[in-house]
């Protein structure tokens, strides 16, 4: 199940009355657009390190804590819109009081993880969580609480602090369950929500209603092996897995491969984020343009250029907020087909369905030389003329994409499958190369789409620049062969009956496109 992220944080929601009305008009417009996209969940982020958002520093007389009713009223509005448009809300405590991660995203003082050392800050977080339970224990539209974002991520104290994080989770759930026995808690691992080994026991002993929130971007290899540890933990503890944060820059192949693996293992995923500046190359739902004079702000902040006057800077910021209006944004449609596997998109041939048994069959007796999906017994080969750097993904400089230059080699008796979710009529093609004729059988949902011979096909080595990564060469050009036309979603199975071919992409094009 695909969702995306909505940030609910101090700089946007607590500027002034004018900006409050602007932002909430934009958010409500977004929910209408979101409904059209047929997405099912919105993740609402809170930077509670800015404690005045929900909990006020000064305690009211005879109270343990005082709460900002304006902020809760805003959240109430958002939850009402969620109900109106039938979109579940995952409430994400993105930044705990005093900071929990050691990285700037939690807005903590000096980027330290003071939550674990400061008893008062941890208690304030418990109080805030209890207040959320009191207010929202009966709000069915809240699908889960995501707690807490990327804890203990950049620190030499990870081993020392992890037991304190475990205590925080256990005590938080214990106290919250006295008020709310219904809602799911999604708990984050350490090191950018990737290390989950300490979820080795029951964290919700009375109600067993918890799961793991994992984060992954393009640095993570899109294969089952990357998820094996957390999937095994979830099975052992009988809990759910949710990819609480993911996305990436121009990573179409990575996204359509990784997200299908998650779907096969019944894990939802949340796209960061809902809106990005035009040209950022991020997998957002909407893009916006910045004001013409925005460079005056960034030149001053980043390069030490002349400082705009207060009035001038405020006018630029006001214009920036106006640019965020949904009706001034552009749908970032280049990503949607790859995320949902609907419309016009390509699947890398090496991005075949992951589950064993009927989804694929390789017959090689050696691990493939590309070092990817080693357990599937396929020959994955680098395209002609491509030689990966010896250090691979550990090489200095920008992340390289050797998998973009890997082809799936299928010989007689081998097959691979691909899930297609387009519901209308579309054409299925493949790009491939083969030294000789190849006899193949292609079926979708068990019905034969093509059975016959594909002719010999060449491979054109290119020195062109990669379409998405300026520091890399583009993949080689392969011949394209049309397999047939289909109506409706299904699982496409490509099997070689005789001969051998190397496949580059599965190409889906809606009829007339």
Segments the model singles out, each with a brief description of its role:
Residues 1-2, 7-9, 15-18, 25, ...:
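Active-site mouth of glycoside hydrolases
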Residues 52-54, 215, 352:
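Short loop/turn segments at strand-loop or loop-helix junctions that form parts
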Residues 53-55, 149, 189, 273, ...:
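Residues that line or immediately flank small-molecule/substrate-binding pockets and catalytic motifs
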Residues 55-59, 97-99, 151, 193, ...:
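Feature marks short, surface-exposed loop/turn motifs that line or immediately flank catalytic pockets
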Residues 89-90, 242, 348:
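Conserved Rossmann-like nucleotide-binding pocket used by diverse enzymes
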Residues 126-130, 134-273, 284-292:
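Extracellular glycoside hydrolase catalytic/binding regions
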Residues 253-347, 361, 366, 375:
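Aromatic-rich peripheral "rim/lid" segments of glycoside hydrolase catalytic domains that contact
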Residues 325-513:
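Extracytoplasmic
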């Amino acid at each position: 199940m695909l969702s995306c992220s909505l940030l609910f944080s101090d700089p946007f929601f607590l500027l002034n009355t004018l900006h409050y009305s602007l932002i909430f008009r934009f958010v409500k417009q977004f929910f209408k657009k979101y409904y059209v996209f047929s997405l099912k969940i919105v993740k609402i982020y809170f930077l509670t390190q800015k404690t005045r958002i929900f909990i006020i520093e000064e305690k009211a007389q005879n109270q343990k804590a005082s709460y900002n009713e304006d902020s809760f009223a805003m959240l109430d509005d958002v939850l009402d819109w969620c109900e109106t448009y039938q979109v579940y809300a995952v409430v994400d405590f993105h930044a705990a009081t005093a900071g929990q991660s050691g990285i700037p995203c939690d807005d903590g003082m000096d980027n330290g993880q003071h939550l674990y050392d400061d008893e008062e800050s941890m208690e304030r977080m418990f109080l805030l969580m209890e207040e959320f339970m009191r207010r929202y224990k009966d709000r069915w539209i809240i699908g889960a609480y995501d707690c807490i974002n990327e804890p203990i991520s950049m620190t030499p104290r990870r081993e020392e602090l992890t037991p304190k994080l475990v205590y925080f989770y256990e005590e938080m759930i214990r106290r919250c369950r006295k008020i709310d026995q219904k809602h799911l808690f999604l708990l984050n691992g350490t090191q950018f929500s990737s290390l989950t080994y300490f979820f080795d026991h029951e964290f919700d002993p009375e109600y067993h209603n918890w799961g793991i929130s994992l984060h992954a971007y393009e640095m993570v290899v899109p294969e089952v092996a990357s998820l094996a540890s957390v999937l095994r933990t979830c099975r052992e503890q009988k809990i759910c897995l949710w990819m609480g944060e993911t996305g990436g820059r121009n990573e179409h192949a990575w996204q359509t491969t990784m997200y299908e693996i998650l779907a096969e293992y019944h894990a939802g995923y949340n796209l960061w984020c809902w809106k990005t500046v035009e040209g950022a190359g991020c997998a957002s739902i909407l893009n916006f343009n910045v004001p013409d004079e925005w460079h005056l702000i960034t030149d001053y902040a980043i390069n030490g250029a002349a400082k705009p006057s207060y009035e001038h800077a405020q006018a630029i910021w006001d214009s920036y907020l106006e640019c965020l209006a949904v009706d001034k944004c552009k749908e970032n449609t280049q990503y949607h087909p790859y995320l949902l596997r609907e419309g016009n998109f390509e699947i890398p041939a090496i991005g075949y369905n992951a589950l064993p048994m009927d989804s694929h069959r390789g017959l090689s007796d050696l691990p493939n030389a590309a070092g990817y999906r080693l357990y599937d017994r396929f020959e994955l080969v680098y395209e002609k003329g491509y030689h990966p750097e010896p250090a691979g993904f550990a090489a200095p400089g920008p992340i390289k994409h050797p998998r973009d230059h890997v082809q799936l080699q299928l010989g007689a008796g081998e097959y691979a499958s691909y899930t297609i979710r387009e519901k209308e009529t579309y054409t299925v093609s493949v790009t491939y190369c083969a030294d000789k004729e190849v006899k193949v059988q292609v079926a979708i949902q068990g019905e034969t789409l093509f059975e016959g011979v594909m002719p010999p096909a060449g491979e054109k080595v290119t020195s062109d620049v990669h379409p998405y990564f300026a520091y890399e060469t583009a993949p080689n050009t392969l011949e394209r062969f049309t397999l047939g036309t289909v109506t409706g979603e299904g699982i496409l199975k490509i099997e070689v009956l005789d001969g051998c071919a190397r496949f580059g992409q599965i190409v889906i094009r809606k009829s007339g496109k």
